[in-house]
Amino acid sequence: MIKVEPKYLFLARRRILRRVLLPLFAVLPTVAGLVGCGDQATQEADHYNDLAYYYHYRSLDSTTAYARRALQVARGDDGVIGESLNNLAFVAIMRMDFPRAKQLCDSVNTITDDQIELLVSDILQMRICQRESRNKDFYDSYQQAAQRLRRIDETSLELTPRQQRRMVYARSEYRIVASAYFYYVGLDRQSAQVISGMGEEDLASDTAQLINYWYCYGAGGLLTKGSREEIYQQEFDCLMRAYRLAMESRSTFWIANTLQALSEHLLQRPDGPRLMADNPRDIRLINTDAMPDSLLAGNLAERSLHLFRQFGDIYQKAGSLRTLANCYWQIDD
């Protein structure tokens, strides 16, 4: 066996270190830079998705623009891409382009394994099914969303602050969409039960969902305790809370929605005149055109219709037209 002198052994080791480690050290800054760029791109895309969500009920065009911008800077982050597609699906639903909305939701399921965005996609599918009266498909999406919620709740302590905010939207939207579906198919008890699982304190970080919450209670059918007069007053109070929040947040969609619901409440006889007599301060707040009592409901419906046209929600615009027709019928016009 050949004996190697210690000094030669030291030189050999040094050559190995130079050949192996020095190239590695040269690459590390590049890798760190790529990771940094990836993080920066994700943060930028998250920012655009946050803006897309912010404009959900303010401007559909803005939501579309910011969601597309998020897609452009996503750099292959499947969670970011899934969120962007969900934002675009929301716009498609509002514009009643249900085939496009379903296509976008299906894309989320093939692109990402991000459980939160898959949950949001399931909830959007629930809304599509509700709008298209596809009952079996609704229940399929409803059950799938429930299973995802349970899985996410098992790891809720691991969610980032941004993911926690996203879950405030997902959890509340799940209950709101389900409640609306049960209400329209005549299951009033289930409708009230599913939405009672959350309270306003759960929505403190999401103004849009808090408005939605108060609107659901004010629109009718969920409140059952008390006399007819007491229930109508409670619903009116809920609608006014939603209206004030919508005005403060400049939420075009919710201003229009609350105006339409208030119009329908004021149309009712004898409840409408009683509401006007018992709530003079609130009536002054919504009667911006100083209309006489007999024409106020029609004025609210017209303003609602104008805002829905401006916003671009075809489904709700049809509802405002129906309410306005009832107003004309009421005054024999």
What is each residue range found by the language model?
Residues I2, Y8-A12, F25, G36-D333:
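A "functional boundary" signal
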Residues R14-R19:
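N-terminal Sec-pathway targeting helices
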Residues V20-G33:
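Bacterial N-terminal signal peptides
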